[in-house]
């Protein structure tokens, strides 16, 4: 069960609606990148906003495949996306992208032990609401530009997204467990991020499994 845990005045919660061609959404070779591009741009927005105010990150901000934002091995936030039809617009659909971040939540008020807050992994930050607005501006500007490029040439931008995501993917190289919707699981090491945004997991027998849709958790050492 996945739920949002929000602390008023200490969290960043936003939903953004974007319009995307139906052809891209239906193209399984590129559509997996839409949510990940949103995550990549949110990471860039966080890092950029912290630097804008003279802050310092003590931990790298990374992305856990496919939709979580991590810092110091703990969850800082998450990104979700949902497709919604646009009435009387057959060639485009809306995608609602939701983001939740812990900005100034104290350690003792975090919802779970495996979560963290930006104030716990960075120093010299401004007021949480000032930082929130700066992150929002950077994210919207960056995402607007990336999605425009993606619509212009989705296959070119999929390559670009993979190149950007691979070095900041926290999941890669780690032992993980994938939970599928049918109740089955798969354990192994995440070894590659593929052209279509799927994840390759190598099991204990050396068999490679391509995972497109699953809840993938990193196993404790």
What are the functions of these language-model segments?
Residues 1-93, 120, 124-141, 145-156:
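Contiguous, small/hydrophobic- and glycine-enriched helical/loop subdomains that border
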Residues 10-12, 59, 95-99, 114, ...:
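A generic structural signal for short beta-strands and their flanking turns/coil linkers
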Residues 21, 103-106, 198:
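Short, acidic Gly/Pro/Ser/Thr-rich loop/turn segments
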Residues 64-65, 74, 105, 113-116, ...:
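Residue-level signal for pocket-adjacent positions within structured domains
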Residues 88-122:
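Short, acidic (Asp/Glu-rich) active-site segment that either coordinates a divalent metal cofactor
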Residues 137-221:
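Glycine-rich, charge-dense phosphate/pyrophosphate-binding loop(s)
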């Amino acid at each position: 069960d996945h739920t949002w845990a929000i602390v008023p005045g200490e969290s960043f919660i936003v939903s953004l609606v974007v319009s995307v061609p139906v052809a891209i959404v239906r193209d399984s070779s590129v559509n997996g990148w839409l949510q990940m591009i949103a995550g990549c741009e949110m990471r860039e927005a966080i890092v950029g906003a912290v630097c804008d105010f003279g802050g310092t990150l003590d931990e790298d901000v990374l992305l856990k495949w496919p939709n979580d934002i991590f810092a110091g091995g703990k969850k800082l936030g998450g990104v979700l996306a949902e497709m919604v039809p646009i009435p009387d617009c057959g060639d485009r659909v809306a995608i609602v992208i939701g983001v939740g971040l812990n900005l100034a939540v104290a350690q003792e008020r975090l919802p779970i032990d495996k979560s963290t807050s930006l104030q716990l992994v960075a120093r010299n930050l401004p007021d949480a609401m000032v930082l929130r607005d700066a992150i929002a501006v950077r994210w919207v500007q960056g995402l607007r530009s990336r999605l425009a490029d993606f619509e212009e040439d989705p296959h070119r931008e999929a390559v670009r997204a993979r190149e950007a995501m691979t070095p900041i993917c926290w999941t890669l190289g780690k032992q993980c467990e994938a939970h599928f919707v049918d109740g089955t699981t798969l354990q192994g090491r995440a070894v590659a991020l593929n052209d279509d945004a799927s994840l390759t997991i190598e099991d204990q027998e050396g068999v490679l499994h391509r995972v497109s849709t699953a809840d993938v958790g990193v196993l404790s050492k």
